[in-house]
Design a protein with these regions (language model features):
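Conserved pre-motif I regulatory segment
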Residues: 2-42
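Walker A/P-loop NTP-binding motif
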Residues: 34-35, 47-63, 80-82
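Pre-Walker A (Motif I) flank of P-loop NTPase domains
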Residues: 35-41, 62-63, 115-116
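Hydrophobic positions in the central parallel beta-sheet of the AAA+
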Residues: 41, 65-66, 118-120, 142-144
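Conserved nucleic-acid-binding Ia/Ib motif block in the N-terminal RecA-like helicase ATPase lobe
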Residues: 65, 71-120
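ATP-hydrolysis module of ASCE/P-loop NTPase motor domains
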Residues: 114-129, 141
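SF2 helicase catalytic motif II
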Residues: 130-152
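Single conserved hydrophobic/aromatic residue that forms the stacking wall/gate
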Residues: 149-161
Length: 161
């Protein structure tokens, strides 16, 4: 994996996102992603989790696949990325809210190399056409953003006596 000096990471943070410094352990997490290491990130809401995969996606060859559970969250993330770039193709999502024409445009942007972040709902990854599409492209890494999923203990029905 390509090595990035701290000053270059800070320069790219400013260039792409307008921030002059990282929060908490973002820089260490980003370095791990850039080095191809499996990385688990647990941060509070507003802690900057998304940047931990967005900045590496901008710096690496290929497209980062982000698995996110909510269509609204995907749209917000894509809209936010598009505010940082003059190219609206920089980030896209593929989910059930898109018609065939929109899906074709997303795929064309990804295949052309414009797209650096592609968001999927988990269930979209079970569709054969999406799996086939992923085999055609260079994926830089996968990120699973489960920030809004609530995991609780399973409940069992009371036994009937």
């Amino acid at each position: 994996m390509k090595q990035f000096e701290s000053s270059l990471l800070h320069d790219k943070l400013k260039e792409y996102f307008g921030f002059s410094s990282f929060k908490g352990n973002q820089e260490a997490v980003i370095r791990n992603v850039l080095e191809g290491k499996d990385t688990f990130v647990l941060m509070p809401t507003g802690g900057g989790k998304s940047l931990c995969y967005q900045l590496p996606a901008m710096l690496m060859e290929g497209v980062a696949i982000v698995i996110s559970p909510l269509i609204a969250l995907m749209k917000n993330q894509v809209d936010a990325m598009r505010t940082f770039s003059a190219d609206s193709g920089i980030a896209h999502f593929l989910n059930s809210s898109l018609n065939k024409t929109a899906v074709a445009q997303v795929r064309a942007d990804v295949l052309s190399g414009k797209t650096k972040l592609l968001y999927f709902a988990p269930e979209s990854l079970t569709k054969e056409d999406n799996v086939a599409f992923l085999h055609k492209i260079k994926v830089s890494f996968y990120a699973i953003d489960l920030s809004l999923i609530h995991i609780s203990e399973p409940t069992r029905p009371e036994p009937i006596s």
